[in-house]
UniProtKB/Swiss-Prot annotation:
One of its GO terms (molecular function) is rRNA binding. The lineage of its organism: Eukaryota, Viridiplantae, Streptophyta, Embryophyta, Tracheophyta. It comes from Vitis vinifera (Grape). InterPro entries: Ribosomal_uS11, Ribosomal_uS11_bac-type, Ribosomal_uS11_CS, Ribosomal_uS11_sf. Residues 9-23 have a biased composition (Basic residues). One of its GO terms (biological process) is translation. Residues 1-23 are annotated as: Disordered. This is Small ribosomal subunit protein uS11c. Part of the 30S ribosomal subunit. Keywords: Chloroplast, Plastid, Ribonucleoprotein, Ribosomal protein, RNA-binding, rRNA-binding. It is found in: Plastid, Chloroplast. One of its GO terms (cellular component) is ribosome. PROSITE patterns: RIBOSOMAL_S11.
Length: 138
């Protein structure tokens, strides 16, 4: 009779095996993507490899609360806490999107103690490209 295949690393039993070893990262890039529905904060090293990330959804906010400034502030704090422990001192900030969480996330990043070399808005703007969707009638 065939032996049952053991389940390794399912969602229920959490992380099996060890995490990647924490590297010392003195400088990095913080990407903030703020949409109307959610805010995603990703911290990468200078080469673009993801070190840490967080979003309003992973912080426990659900539904319309994910788009709030407080949710963005919490997500930014969560993402940055881990990289500060890994020794990040300087960072560049790239902010994308029109959401409410833009300023709140930036305020949380400033409060974390990381020295910001610059803050850049990288929201994609069309040079009159695709036709936008029709306006909502509520």
């Amino acid at each position: 009779m065939a032996k049952p295949i053991p389940r390794i690393g399912s969602r229920r039993n959490g992380r099996i095996g060890s995490r990647k070893s924490a590297r010392r990262i003195p400088k990095g890039v913080i990407h903030v993507q703020a949409s109307f529905n959610n805010t995603i904060v990703t911290v990468t090293d200078v080469r673009g490899r993801v070190v840490s990330w967080s979003s309003a959804g992973t912080c426990g906010f659900r539904g319309t609360r994910r788009g709030t400034p407080f949710a963005a502030q919490t997500a930014a704090g969560n993402a940055i806490r881990t990289v500060v422990d890994q020794g990040m001192q300087r960072a560049e900030v790239m902010i994308k999107g029109p959401g409410l969480g833009r300023d709140a996330a930036l305020r949380a990043i400033r409060r974390s103690g990381i020295l910001l070399s610059f803050v850049r808005d990288v929201t994609p703007m069309p040079h009159n490209g695709c036709r936008p969707p029709k306006k909502r009638r509520v």
